[in-house]
Amino acid sequence: MAERILIVEDEEKLARFIELELLHEGYAVEKAADGRDGLEKAQAGGVDLVLLDVMLPGMSGMELLRRLRRASDVPVIMVTARDAVMDKVTGLDTGADDYITKPFEIEELLARIRAALRKRGGAAQGAEGLTCGAL
């Protein structure tokens, strides 16, 4: 089954561009155009990764991130025009796994998605495969 990515982005052209690239890469995609819809879709379950804008109608991306972190460890990559160092620090300290600023190269975003999904899958897989012999 394809990994499912939720795009929470209010700029429709950008959301559609990212969606098409992700579909081309073999991911399943769901979109939300505002923070409240994004929260509902994320809480419904089955999401493997969230791409999250900061400036959203209805609920800010930071508030959505705070609420997600209360109940979930799903990887979240912030995708935003907010490029000040303190914006990045706030996003990462609030619980984002990664932070990329607009404009971005799609190849970099795809690489960051693969890395975040690898980390999520690798933690569970790696724990079973590690053993320590006699010391």
Model-derived regions: residue spans:
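Conserved acidic carboxylate
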Residues: 9
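Short, Lys/Arg-enriched segments at the junction into DNA-binding effector domains
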Residues: 4, 115-135
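Charged docking surfaces used in two-component/phosphorelay signaling
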Residues: 16-24
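Short hydrophobic/Thr-rich beta-strand motif most characteristic of the beta2 strand and flanking loop
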Residues: 26-33, 41
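The feature encodes the CheY-like receiver
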Residues: 15, 57, 84, 102
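Active-site residues of response regulator receiver
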Residues: 53, 80
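Acidic catalytic/metal-coordinating carboxylates
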Residues: 34-37, 60-63, 87
